[in-house]
Amino acid sequence: MPISKRKNESDSESEGENKELVDVDFEFFGPAQIDYLAVKRLLNQLFSGDAGEFQVEKLTELILEQPGIGSTVKTDGIDSDPYAILTVLNVNINRDHPSIKAITKYLLEKVPKGSPAGSALNDILSPQVLAASSGHTGLIISERLINMPPQIMPPMYRMLGDELTNATNQNEPYRFDNYIVISRCFRFDDNEESATGISQPAKRQKRKGGLLRSYHAEDEYIEKVALAKAEYEYTNRIERDEDSFGVDLAGRVIIFPQSKFDTFVSLIEAGFPTGRS
C-alpha cells in the first residue's frame, strides 16, 4: 500500500524549508515468530510504565501463537521488523493466561466501578461471564511506531474483520459480542501547549489542567461507536519536575460492541483515505 509521507529538508542558506513527498510502500504480513522482539517492544510502548505488570514476554508469545489472526506492517519484506501490529485475543478462552489475568485485574482496578466504563467492564469481565460459553470479549491489541500514518489502520481493521469471519466460519473461538481496546493518550498543560505551537483540535478534553490528546488518531472514531471509555493514570508513571517540559502519559480503555465493528471500519476508511495525497 503506497502512502505519501512528507520529508522536510532544511535549507542552510535560509530559514525556509523545502518539502518533498516520499512514497513509502507498506506491506502487510501475519504476525510470525521472527517478529517476537519487535512485537514485544511495541507492547512495552503500548502499556508504557505499567508494562512490567503484564508479563509482556508471555503476551507476545500468545499473540504469535494465533495463526491467521492479526497483521503487522513492514517496509522491507517479511524478514524485516514490523512497525505496527493489530490483533485480537479471546479474553474468555485465555482468562487463565497470566498476561490476560493481569490485564483484566488491572482494568477492573483502574476504572471506577460506578463509571460507565467501569460498569461495562464489570459486565464483561466478571468471573462468571468469563467462564461462560458465549458472550465472549475480544481484547484488541493495536500499536505502531509514532511516525506511522493512521492510513495504515483501515486496511488492517478490514483484514482483521475478514479474518474473524473466516475463523468463526471454521468454528474457531473468535466470535465476540464486545471488544476492549487499550490505548494511550498524553497531555500538555496550557503553557506547554502554547510553547509547542501545535494547533489545538476542535474536539478536546480538559484533564487536570491539560489538553488530552490521542497517540492513536483512530480512537476518535472508536469513541463514536463505543459503549463507554475511560482514561486512567499509570501506576508507574514518570513524575515530572514542576519546571520540566514534556508530556504526561495516561492510559485509555474503550469498549465497543461487535455490532458496530463494520461501522467503525467505515468511519476510519472515510477519515483516513489511503489514496496518494
Regions found by a protein language model. Give the residues of each.
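Intrinsically disordered, low-complexity, positively biased terminal segments
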Residues: 2-277
